[in-house]
């Protein structure tokens, strides 16, 4: 189901509650959610299998200020160049953002919806970021994909004491749309 302005308070409550199961999850406010550049509230999808919110995901179009343009290919990639986007081509990419679900099954339904929306809007790629330990990752891996392994680093301007001590076993929240 598409999000709407009247759902924003409930969406924010869900994100704050369920999001706490991930490390580094943002402390969303209604104002912050309404003011994300390029993210329309109706691009948020909400899962309500039993009436209550069980999951949220958004399609965030940042093409107005963030683009990927193929500059060329080198090394072994030159061999595949005829099958890849042309040099100079703009890749229309959107981000799966605000990912928060109570279960992989709920996430699977939301991801299907957001993939369909991305296809309908003619995006070439849907970019998604998940921690390697995230129980939602196997669902995303079920789609044709390219993995780009990365490391998250925690930086601190003080001695980092309290932040470092709060890290635990929970998967990190990685929203690559905000990077």
Task: Identify the function of each model-found stretch.
Residues 1, 49, 55-179:
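Active-site/acyl-donor-binding loops of N-acyltransferases
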Residues 35-39:
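Short loop/turn motifs at secondary-structure junctions and domain boundaries
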Residues 41-46, 56:
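Short hydrophobic/aromatic beta-strand element in the GNAT-like acyltransferase core
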